[in-house]
């Protein structure tokens, strides 16, 4: 039996869990993604973030 489809499925599921843990939703209001850089540096230690629906989402 070919185990390649099972391996690909498991890799996909694991990568989905890892990517969902890499973002932090905040209550910091924003108008553009550039206004999230400094607040995200305080939350995650990195200046990676974007403005989504008027709130900053920070990434690790």
UniProtKB/Swiss-Prot annotation:
A Pfam family hit: Toxin_2
Tissue spec. comment: Expressed by the venom gland.
Record site feature (Aromatic residue of the functional dyad), residues: 59
InterPro entries: Scorpion_toxin-like_sf, Scorpion_toxinS_K_inh
Domains as described in the record: Has the structural arrangement of an alpha-helix connected to antiparallel beta-sheets by disulfide bonds (CS-alpha/beta).
Signal peptide: 1-22
Major subcellular location class: secreted
Protein location: Secreted
Disulfide linkage: 30-51, 36-56, 40-58
Site (Basic residue of the functional dyad): 50
Gene Ontology terms: cellular component: extracellular region
Superkingdom as given in the UniProt entry: Eukaryota
Example GO molecular function: potassium channel regulator activity
Protein name: Potassium channel toxin alpha-KTx 12.5
Organism phylogeny: Eukaryota, Metazoa, Ecdysozoa, Arthropoda, Chelicerata
Function: This recombinant toxin inhibits the mammalian voltage-gated potassium channels Kv1.3/KCNA3 (IC(50)=28 nM). Kv1.1/KCNA1 and Kv1.2/KCNA2 potassium channels are also weakly inhibited (IC(50)=1.73 uM and IC(50)=12.63 uM, respectively).
Keywords associated with the record: Disulfide bond, Ion channel impairing toxin, Neurotoxin, Potassium channel impairing toxin, Secreted, Signal, Toxin, Voltage-gated potassium channel impairing toxin
Family: Belongs to the short scorpion toxin superfamily. Potassium channel inhibitor family. Alpha-KTx 12 subfamily.
């Amino acid at each position: 039996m070919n185990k390649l489809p099972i391996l690909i499925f498991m890799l996909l599921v694991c990568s989905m869990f890892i990517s969902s843990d890499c973002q932090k939703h905040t209550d910091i209001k924003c108008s553009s993604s550039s206004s999230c850089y400094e607040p995200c540096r305080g939350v995650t230690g990195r200046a990676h973030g974007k403005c989504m629906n008027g709130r900053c989402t920070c990434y690790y």
